[in-house]
Amino acid sequence: DPGYAYLGELLASRGIILASVDENFINGSWSDIFGGLEEENDARGWLLLEHLKVWHQWNKTGGHLLQGKIDTANLALIGHSRGGEAVAHAAMFNKLPFYPDDASVPFDYNFNIKSVVAIAPVDGQYEPGESRAKFEDVSYLVLHGAQDADVSSYMGSQQYERIRFTDSLYHFKAGVYVYGANHGQFNTSWGENDTGNPFTGLLNLKQLLSAEDQQKIGEVYISSFLDITLKNKREYLPLFIDARRGREWLPETIFLSQFEDSSFEPVANYDEDFNLASTTREDGKVTGENLSVWREQEIKLKWEKKGSRALFAGWNYALEAPSDSIGSVPDSLLASYAIRLPAMVVDSSAALVFSMAESTESATPKSEGKWARDKPEKKDANSDTDKEETKKEGEENEDEK
């Protein structure tokens, strides 16, 4: 695909071979007008592995132009959109003995795939065994634009959550959510219109970064990621932890970063069970006081669920006047949420990481709906209280006359 030539030229200048595999023919053709391929991303992933097989053959074929010139011990896969999901399937298929939906189709790849890059990927278009794809011990980078009008939810974050590191080697996964980036401008041919005619007028194109700036972001993150995962140049790791470390290279915009490496030890990720007092670590304990909201639930994206859970905590102080401050609340009524762990020893390179976001829900959810406690009691028409009030109203009316 010539739309990625800019990326190929950059990587080639850094000693990395980039081969673009055109799989657009799988999207459909005129012959599919009454029904074509569906849920075909497994085919895309399989096709990538078959291409790698050919490259391995060329590397070993005497007299071939590429004989001995390919470092087959250091391989990476890059995909965009549906291809962004396909590279995840390829990484999963690479270590399997059979196609997961049909054991009559044997696999025997086992290539040295060190890393995967997903640009604005979809997720769940193909589900092996009716489950979402997941793979282990391969580094992962996902880039997604906040103004993506094609894949409008940050679907690569779902794949991010499912990646695990289990061996003794160093791996990491990173996510970068970019304000002003759309779906198409990572490819020089796709352009600014993510929806296609006649819906272009529905898009606010003024929010977009320029195509040059968006492609620069792709160049910086992808080349740095491959330098780390294929060449072990870990001096670029800080870029994926904090985008401000790349301010000299990156265009001016907002970057939201996620990062987790194989040394990461979760304390409380809220995915382990439904016990609000437990932590991911078996030796931890949670306590909470005076919280009006305390629950754990699935995180919602724009259109889907993220595939992981979070703590939702809220509190509400009924202050009597606008001038009141937190200092007027007795200590016994202060809200708190605490994670208690046994004493542990950590070295100076360790960091405690919190991931937090503001919720738009009410801090007093039990004041309305089925939880309402302060609704006036419904009076019985024959009750003594009702009769007494009626009598008093009648007396007042007589006085007015």
Named regions from a protein language model:
Residues 2-30, 38-46, 172-175, 179:
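Active-site machinery of serine-nucleophile hydrolases
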Residues 32-81:
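Gly/Ser-rich "nucleophile elbow"/oxyanion-hole loop immediately N-terminal to the catalytic nucleophile
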Residues 180-182, 189-340, 347-353, 357-364, ...:
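Alpha/beta-hydrolase-fold serine-hydrolase catalytic core, especially in secreted/extracellular enzymes
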Residues 84-96:
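Short glycine-enriched nucleophile-adjacent loop
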